[in-house]
Amino acid sequence: QAYDRARNLTKETARAGFIAGIIIGAVFAMLGLVAGSLFSPNPAIQKLVTTGMIVVGILMPLQGWMWALDGILIGAGDFRYLAFTCGASALVHIAALVVLVFAIGPYLPDDLARIAALWLVMGVFLMGCRGIANGLRAKGDTWIKNAVL
């Protein structure tokens, strides 16, 4: 029974994280349309802020889902797995940043494309890898066995 409750709670928490990510992401992206002036009077900087906030807002559902699973796995005491996968995800992210800076960045047309690419790399590679790792772990039984059985 504890196993079934943990499975159900995981599913519902992940869903809630995704839905919260949609809502927060939409608000964040919309705020990005007007928030640039809070950061700088320079119109070029304002456009960079707007672009970054829109990209982050679009990626927020993935992050909400991933962070919800983080919470479940942290609550289950699955620290060693999370530490390893966070470190591995960071290495993938760093490699993607190096590729972006040296191989792709010089061919991007302007600073708006570069800021969008920078945030996309963070969202896709860092958060994406963490999401894959957390999703695979949550589907398995190891963390449940360690936590509730």
Say what each PLM segment does:
Residues 27, 65, 92-95:
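Residue positions within transmembrane alpha-helices of multi-pass solute transporters
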